[in-house]
C-alpha cells in the first residue's frame, strides 16, 4: 500500500528483488483517488482459502473497479513504468548534485525516493 502501484518503476516494488510474495495488498494508487483495495495471492494460497473466506460487503463496487481498470490502462498505455524509472533517476541525480552536510545520501527506486 505504501509504495503504490508503479511508484518504483515496476508495477510492484517486489519486482526489484528476487522474491515472490505469497500475498500483496494494493489500495490508494490502484483507484487513482477512488477508494479501492485489492489482495493478490499465489494460486497455492488461494486454493487453501475457504469459500467465502475473502468476502466483503463492499467488494466489486462498479465505480471503483472502473477506476482501477482506467489506472491500469493508463500505466500500460502510456508506458508509465519506464517514465517513472527515468524521472526517478533524474531526480536522484539532481538531488545528489546539491549535496550538503545535511543530505548524507540519496536512495530509492523510481519515484519512491
Regions found by a protein language model. Name each.
Residues 1-113:
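Conserved N-terminal phosphate-binding loop of PLP-dependent enzymes in the Aspartate aminotransferase
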Amino acid at each position: 500500500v505504501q509504495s503504490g502501484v508503479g511508484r518504483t518503476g515496476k508495477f510492484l516494488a517486489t519486482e526489484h528483488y528476487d522474491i515472490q510474495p505469497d500475498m500483496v495488498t494494493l489500495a490508494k494508487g490502484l483507484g487513482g483517488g477512488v477508494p479501492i483495495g485489492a489482495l493478490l495471492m499465489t494460486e497455492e494460497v488461494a486454493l487453501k482459502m475457504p469459500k467465502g473466506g475473502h468476502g466483503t460487503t463492499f467488494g466489486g463496487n462498479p465505480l471503483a473497479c472502473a477506476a482501477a481498470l482506467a489506472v491500469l490502462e493508463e500505466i500500460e498505455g502510456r508506458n508509465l513504468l519506464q517514465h517513472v524509472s527515468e524521472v526517478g533517476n533524474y531526480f536522484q541525480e539532481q538531488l545528489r548534485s546539491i549535496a550538503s552536510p545535511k543530505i548524507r545520501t540519496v536512495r530509492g527506486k523510481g519515484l519512491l525516493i
